[in-house]
């Protein structure tokens, strides 16, 4: 995917909530409230972020099973795993999935998340390529 893709505020916020919930052990509702307020989400963006974040958290077991089947890899870094959980939720369980947008945004979230975690650019590109491959198989 092009690095020129701009992440939607709703998906960026949902990704942050998923990371805080699973990586830091935060309560999802508290993480969501703080993240949505910090991002200034309102209206449709707020509703989309809520649906994606809570959905990805609620479907973790199913998503993790699918990831294990599709990934063919035992260890997955936190940035890629959160992007996969979010992308799979949107692809598999959303009422109106926008498949291309879901994959594209998950790929960009994995890249941005890996860079934010301090990974070198090459590893961030590898994480985004991995997420793209797994979601295309889904």
Q: Positions of the model-derived regions?
A:
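Class I Rossmann-like S-adenosyl-L-methionine
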Residues: 1-138
């Amino acid at each position: 995917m092009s690095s020129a893709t701009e992440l939607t505020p709703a998906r960026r916020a949902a990704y942050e909530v998923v990371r805080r919930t699973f990586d830091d052990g935060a309560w999802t509702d508290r993480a969501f409230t703080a993240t949505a307020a910090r991002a200034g989400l309102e209206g449709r963006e707020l509703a989309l972020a809520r649906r994606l974040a809570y959905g990805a958290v609620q479907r973790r077991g199913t998503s993790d099973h699918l990831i294990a089947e599709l990934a063919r890899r035992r260890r997955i870094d936190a940035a890629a795993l959160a992007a996969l959980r979010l992308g799979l939720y949107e692809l598999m369980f959303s009422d109106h999935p926008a498949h291309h947008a879901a994959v594209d945004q998950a790929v960009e979230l994995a890249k941005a998340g890996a860079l934010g975690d301090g990974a070198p650019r090459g590893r961030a590109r590898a994480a985004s390529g991995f997420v793209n491959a797994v979601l295309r198989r889904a």
